[in-house]
Curated annotation (Swiss-Prot):
Pfam families with a match to the protein in the record: PDDEXK_1, UvrD-helicase, UvrD_C
Catalytic activity: Couples ATP hydrolysis with the unwinding of duplex DNA by translocating in the 3'-5' direction; ATP + H2O = ADP + phosphate + H(+)
Organism for this UniProt entry: Streptococcus pyogenes serotype M4 (strain MGAS10750)
Quaternary state and interactors: Heterodimer of AddA and AddB/RexB.
UvrD-like helicase ATP-binding domain span: 39-495
Binding site for ATP: 60-67
Name of the protein in question: ATP-dependent helicase/nuclease subunit A
Cofactor(s) required, per the database record: Mg(2+)
Family membership noted in the UniProt record: Belongs to the helicase family. AddA subfamily.
UniProt gene name: addA
NCBIfam families named in the record: addA_Gpos
Function of the protein: The heterodimer acts as both an ATP-dependent DNA helicase and an ATP-dependent, dual-direction single-stranded exonuclease. Recognizes the chi site generating a DNA molecule suitable for the initiation of homologous recombination. The AddA nuclease domain is required for chi fragment generation; this subunit has the helicase and 3' -> 5' nuclease activities.
Entry-linked PANTHER family: ATP-DEPENDENT HELICASE_NUCLEASE SUBUNIT A, UVRD / RECB / PCRA DNA HELICASE FAMILY MEMBER
Amino acid sequence: MLFNINEKGEPLVISFAPFLSPEAIKHLQENERCSDQSQKRTAQQIEAIYTSGQNILVSASAGSGKTFVMVERILDKILRGVSIDRLFISTFTVKAATELRERIENKLYSQIAQTTDFQMKVYLTEQLQSLCQADIGTMDAFAQKVVSRYGYSIGISSQFRIMQDKAEQGVLKQEVFSKLFSEFMNQKEAPVFRALVKNFSGNCKDTSAFRELVYTCYSFSQSTENPKIWLQENFLSAAKTYQRLEDIPDHDIELLLLAMQDTANQLRDVTDMEDYGQLTKAGSRSAKYTKHLTIIEKLSDWVRDFKCLYGKAGLDRLIRDVTGLIPSGNYVTVSKVKYPVFKTLHQKLKQFRHLETILMYQKDCFPLLEQLQDFVLAFSEAYLAVKIQESAFEFSDIAHFAIKILEENTDIRQSYQQHYHEVMVDEYQDNNHMQERLLTLLSNGHNRFMVGDIKQSIYRFRQADPQIFNQKFRDYQKKPEQGKVILLKENFRSQSEVLNVSNAVFSHLMDESVGDVLYDEQHQLIAGSHAQTVPYLDRRAQLLLYNSDKDDGNAPSDSEGISFSEVTIVAKEIIKLHNDKGVPFEDITLLVSSRTRNDIISHTFNQYGIPIVTDGGQQNYLKSVEVMVMLDTLRTINNPRNDYALVALLRSPMFAFDEDDLARIALQKDNELDKDCLYDKIQRAVIGRGAHPELIHDTLLGKLNVFLKTLKSWRRYAKLGSLYDLIWKIFNDRFYFDFVASQAKAEQAQANLYALALRANQFEKSGYKGLYRFIKMIDKVLETQNDLADVEVAAPKQAVNLMTIHKSKGLQFPYVFILNCDKRFSMTDIHKSFILNRQHGIGIKYLADIKGLLGETTLNSVKVSMETLPYQLNKQELRLATLSEQMRLLYVAMTRAEKKVYFIGKASKSKSQEITDPKKLDKLLPLALREQLLTFQDWLLAIADIFSTEDLYFDVRFIEDSDLTQESVGRLQTPQLLNPDDLKDNRQSETIARALDMLEAVSQLNANYEAAIHLPTVRTPSQLKAAYEPLLEPIGVDIIEKSSRSLSDFTLPHFSKKAKVEASHIGSALHQLMQVLPLSKPINQQTLLDALRGIDSNEEVKTALDLKKIESFFCDTSLGQFFQTYQKHLYREAPFAILKVDPISQEEYVLRGIIDAYFLFDDHIVLVDYKTDKYKQPIELKKRYQQQLELYAEALTQTYKLPVTKRYLVLMGGGKPEIVEV
């Protein structure tokens, strides 16, 4: 029940329907099942929408309508009296939050239109108005709200900013690291610390590897609930626990014994084959058969009697025995077919070799790890202190502050728990432990609603942990009193061809060991409508493999990028779809695993005329060719003796010196100088005093003179003008901005150059001045291996989409091509010198000196890198986690398709026919095999091989070079734009002649009106201040009563230790204050403070305003009192526009500006302008701004047809306010 007030002030009572009981939900499900609606809600969707009063975990498979369920549940809550602001709704991205908010808004509008109850309309309208304030957003956004509101409780200012720029973070980290590193190198335990650094960096001079280790440990800790506690208690957990053979986890022993038994079973299967050759011609057992029987018998015995014969303490002995028993090769050959019987066991043995030696030396690395723990803790504290000082934080800092606020303040925590009716989370499978802790603190323990799909958890690189979802799933199934699990299995997106192949692949591939979930019946995809089950034979999934037999047979299949042949296969299929099926390009999407090395796709598609839109690449703004050319130009202007930058500028299209030119210049050295820079050689070449003046011909001399003249003008301008103007002068002088417009990706290149000028402008506005500092800042960003954000440009709509699998999540496309299926999964992390694990902490490779094991030797030391036991433990878990995420990536990619999915790869046809496994023992691929295979393609081929008797719903086709000829690929059919029978089409010469005439006419016009071409259409009084004097006659003028101004904001790293307040910001704040100051009240400090709160400036700027000086102006000067006396005649901050004529080109242009204040009387006008400039004598500013006030007076006179009798400058930049009449 809710009370509202009507127009007469009378209470309106709204009675809401109660939440549905389980019986009512079942009744609703039955009614829906029996209804004749074309699109019915499933029973599980209804259950997820209406179940209340308990924790709910919704496991929503791909395309099952989870967003629909969330929106319907939110609407149902609202209709039952739960205000939208009492729901906490967390989304994974800002974009998802915006889309969800829009859907709720549309539902509310629809509900208002359908409702006839006036009271309900009022209530729903209120909900609509509250929607923009509701807590619908990312966890980061909510954490910012909490800290902004309650940060004071833990000593954090509410006036903070978020450091989203990686470059800024990198610079601050580097400063903290360098200072801390110096301190540790000079402490008491310095020898141990030096040994630690050498273990990772090789020496103490190059600290890059050690620095990366510290940064990674810090970042990893930030994803935990409490970074400090994790570093103190968990960081060395495995190092303290696993120090003996007996400490090896049982699971690892079980995997080894399983591999031994599997090997024995496989070998027995092979020996039982008819063609194996058990007997010799004489009828006795063959030597091979006898040897293999011995292996089978001993492996089986050792597995069965492991505890009696060996136990954990004897594990090292078992490894030696098994290694000595089995052959060194992986294969057993029968009738020329190779069976990889021993391959898996060899890999397992490799994991356990040298354990005894490793454990002997492992204890020596523990003091190093303690030093690392101390350093990372100190770094975390020091880095946070710097951020607090700057009042600039990362998102993880804000989340931890929010957790701390809620943990340490019971009243604040309880207020949130009481306020929120329900805590809803989308994409729950991608939460990390920090976010989970925050959600737990917001919930009252029985009001959580979590939606996700563990099969789509693909953000481990953001420290997302799918086990959070998994643990909830298990807990709620075992203990229903804790919460309810609801499965959404019906897929409403894809045709049966896509659903069937997805089920076939993952039922053989995914389980809890690899994939983190058993892909059984409760997780399989089911068509949600009859229309999806209609078969289309031409939409069967295709695994298209380029046959690499004719390539270099030893070429690795794990190349980073996709091959030209694979892209050609894709182009051929797209041309066929477009020509034969009429499929529009925008219905086709190419999915890749990463955003790099995809240029060959765009290049090949351009050759075939297929339009394509790419997702871009990594941030490479500063590495784009056009930006690098401009940066080298700026470096040369700053220091012409920088040879690298100078050569780059000379070779650039701006001056186009070739190798021959540079060689001739390089020979113009001074024999008396040992070192001679290129700039000096250029100067000697011009005056003919080089070592070989005869090499400088007239053409080259002319180019050199032009270069030196241009460079000289740029260097002179750099001392006088702004960076922004300098960059545009370079563009205009050498036509570089126009040049890039003629190159590939012209729009992107021009956007990059334009952004460079804007970023330079923003840099100077942030408090830094000068070319040198700008270059230094850019170089510092590059040193930290960071970059600035890329510039986005509009993309064509009718084109094939190319994007990463991660980017495609949540989207759907009719036709999907999964490219580069032969690319090996990135296992870089498992080969690093350290591996981190949330439970076990850190495991490292230890650089041990094993000189003592070698006896007498002349060597000073023998260093060997050893994988410590904690490292091996973490490595195995990381390997499985990586494979699991890759498996889920494949699931996400396949389930994006609506109609058909293609897999594109490259393989040797002859090698692929080797038997993967002699016998299938289960519905799943053997675990050892799944761990061993490292590409999507390998998984698919193994499934096709082992389960060949089943219908797997995809075909494997090898494509030969003969299938990829120009004739075989074909070409796009484009509409005929011209009539071939029309004779006018043959008059090409006439058309070309006409075009040339037009170009000539344009050139003549450009010459005649050159001044007008370079004339801006809009100018400001400031730009005209020193341009054209005296002022020429105006033609038209108008005063604009109301206007809004918008400022473009381009963010660059801010490196200052203390916030710098710009004079321009103070001036802007003063003008705002003078505009809003109420003159009807007495002007005093309180009046000014009240008005100051209403202006749009930060606190530093407000604090910098001298309110006493403003008060003095109104109280102590006659003009200030004039303001208060004649306030009814006063107009403040009035924009104007005036049409003027350029004295050179005689072209018209618009002059715009804003008049600070003027008094309009019946017969005259008084003009006032405020200035905050610093000055020595008032006459300086009078001369500086006289012309500007003349322009203002002229605009007023033309508008009102009245004379401006008085013009005043109010000077606020001195010790006291001064009034100057102009």
